[in-house]
Amino acid sequence: MTITPEQLIAMLPLLVVILTVVVVMLSIAWRRDHFTIATLTATGFIIALGSLYYVNALGVVDVTTLYHVDGYSSFFTALTIIAGLGTVAFAYPWLEGYQDNKEEFYMLVAIAVIGGILLSSAHHLASMFIGIELLTLPLFGLIGYAFQQRPSLEASIKYMLLSAAASSFLLFGMALLYAEAGNLSFTAMGQSLSDSNIHKPLVLAGLGMMLVGIGFKLSLFPFQLWTPDVYQGAPAPTGAFLATASKIGIFAVVMRLFLEAPAADSETLRMILGFMAIASILFGNIMALTQKNVKRLLGYSSVSHLGYLLVALIVLQYSPILAQETAEIYLAGYLFASLGAFGAIAVASSPYNKGELESLEDYRGLFWRRPVAAVVMSLMMLSLAGVPITLGFIGKLYVILAGIDSSLWWLTGMVVLGSAIGLFYYLRAAAIVFLRKPDNDNAPAVTTTSQNMATLITLVCAIIVIVLGVWPQPLIELTRFAIIAPAIN
């Protein structure tokens, strides 16, 4: 097979991040230097993000049967790289006090970003599976990076065992679909699996097993039980990546599969997804109400957010354009709000060897010690709650409009109810940072240069959330560029 210059340009973001991994590995082997490795990784991500300008100029490019580049893939690639960049910025101050090898953290993040980029452009079940594994496997190490601390090691082992089981279900489901369709390409599967044979036992079993695997990766009910424990045990920078990039890449490829293989989006499957959406929204919000640990709260709330996102998948058959816009706007808002929230946790916490702030009470009076981190955390909670003048509100509005447009009143009502429940715990977390501590421990905290840099990144996230919440037009224009024309079965 001959690769043309056009195809090479289309693969630029992927190639740049792969090159970054190679350079980081060689640098670690030559001489360990925390600052150099972090700078190399961040530079690689920035170059990969900039290369999307040239990729977009090409339009639609089929690089191989497995890798398809278009506006849709570019949009989700950008979100994945931004998540990786934020994780690197938050990890640097956290790792400064780490007593073991620091540099491998950045290499693992870069490998996971490769998986996310591959998922954004996946056009085939094989590349989908490779992308999911490339994204998931580095997370085992990232979650357990603070292995001297028992919760981190426990979380890593739990995630590894359950993720391995979920991957087995996913792979077996793909094998069953291949047995019926005779092809693993999304488009070819869409042509083979017509409405007449979608109810065949092999196809139903394959779709069901794939749904189990994907449900685990996306923390959807009833496969979400690992989420709060893993979020709590993982270091704050890893939590930022786990909450954003791992969800964005997988959701992007699932939506492409539903768009290009419409038979996979059957009425039966939509009913199951509807049940999962309602259960995820209710379970995530109700469980988050009782949480005193901030990271567990964000873990449960992520379950409800993926429930809201399922609405976009369910309405895909009725309004494909609106469904894609909804998912893209919601995920962009969720990315910046989650990055900002976990970044604020990383900045507000003590250095690694003194532990992280976990309880909500630990954040009481944060405004008087670290005012920027407190304001950012408060704004991020408001955005996650969907309060007006934040990007989170625009995302929720699109979800509700998509439900109304498709006459899914029961699902729309559940989104409104879930958002109302979520307001309670988000507002509680947003308000507590401004309350003074009773022990008068309200003196400003001493900060390092690296913490100031991480604070700056969280501040940028907050500005984006507010600016796009007030004036969402630039983001809406971007999402319109990132629309896939629906296939007709």
UniProtKB/Swiss-Prot annotation:
The chain crosses the membrane at residues 8-28, 35-55, 75-95, 105-125, 127-147, 159-179, 203-223, 235-255, 271-291, 303-323, 329-349, 374-394, 407-427, 456-476. Pfam families: Proton_antipo_M (PF00361). It is found in: Cell inner membrane. It is a multi-pass membrane protein. InterPro entries: NADH-Q_OxRdtase_suN/2, ND/Mrp_TM. GO terms for molecular function: NADH dehydrogenase (ubiquinone) activity; NADH:ubiquinone reductase (non-electrogenic) activity; quinone binding. NDH-1 is composed of 13 different subunits. Subunits NuoA, H, J, K, L, M, N constitute the membrane sector of the complex. This is NADH-quinone oxidoreductase subunit N.
